[in-house]
């Protein structure tokens, strides 16, 4: 499996480079975030051996267990890794997230952000966070409406133990490629409007977490700086019951 994961990662990097060339982007400005949901520690280590340092987890407890196992098995490696929570976050899980994760992509409420800031240990650098934008207005998904983003951005950016870095979005996976790219472009434009506010003049938002295995190129065309790839890195995984 280690060879297959390495081959997959090399293929994804080639795809990123090809998409960037097509749309005039610098591939060094697009981070591969390997989504390691349901992947065992051995698979994570295979990805690390292939050069990946950033991992995305959907479930808090599963992610923390991997971090602790890696810290015990490979202490020299674990410190170089960045762990991103890309799944929903409930209030009763904020402390463990604040204590272990480096990034949270799914901020959509001031209350959650306040708890993360209060519970982030002062010996750790501020937790890097993204606002989740419900760009297509789906009632089936989390995230805030684009019209509410500036107010939430101002509130979150004032919290001392958080650093607001940008926006995350997941449009309807059933949308066609043209519509998907349009929706991602709306998220990029929204970040641009937020950055026009004087509050963000010194530290403008710089991160767009957009795109997965099925729509990576559309996201890159629209300005993604971070693509969340699971199946393309680790292969098809069993559905959790």
Model-derived regions, located:
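Conserved alpha/beta-domain cores
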Residues: 1-214, 220-222, 234-236
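Gly/Pro- and small hydrophobic-enriched strand-loop and loop-to-helix capping segments
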Residues: 224-241
């Amino acid at each position: 499996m280690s060879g297959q994961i390495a081959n997959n990662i090399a293929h994804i990097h080639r795809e990123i480079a090809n998409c960037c060339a097509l749309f005039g982007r610098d591939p060094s400005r697009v981070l591969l975030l390997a989504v390691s949901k349901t992947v065992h520690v051995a698979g994570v280590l295979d990805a690390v051996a292939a050069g990946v340092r950033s991992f995305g987890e959907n479930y808090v407890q599963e992610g923390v267990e991997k971090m602790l196992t890696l810290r015990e098995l490979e202490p020299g490696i674990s410190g170089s890794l960045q762990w991103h929570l890309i799944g929903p976050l409930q209030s009763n899980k904020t402390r463990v997230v604040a204590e272990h994760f480096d990034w949270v992509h799914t901020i959509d409420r001031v209350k959650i952000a306040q708890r993360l800031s209060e519970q982030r240990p002062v010996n750790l650098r501020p937790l890097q966070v993204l606002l989740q934008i419900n760009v297509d207005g789906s009632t089936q998904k989390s995230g805030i409406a684009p019209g509410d983003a500036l107010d939430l951005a101002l509130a979150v950016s004032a919290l001392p133990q958080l650093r607001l870095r940008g926006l995350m979005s997941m449009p309807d996976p059933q949308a066609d490629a043209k519509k998907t790219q349009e929706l991602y472009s709306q998220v990029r434009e929204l970040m641009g409007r937020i950055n026009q506010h004087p509050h963000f003049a010194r530290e403008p938002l710089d991160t767009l977490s957009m795109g997965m295995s099925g729509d990576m190129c559309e996201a890159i065309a629209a300005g993604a700086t971070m693509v969340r790839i699971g199946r393309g890195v680790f292969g098809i995984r069993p559905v959790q019951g």
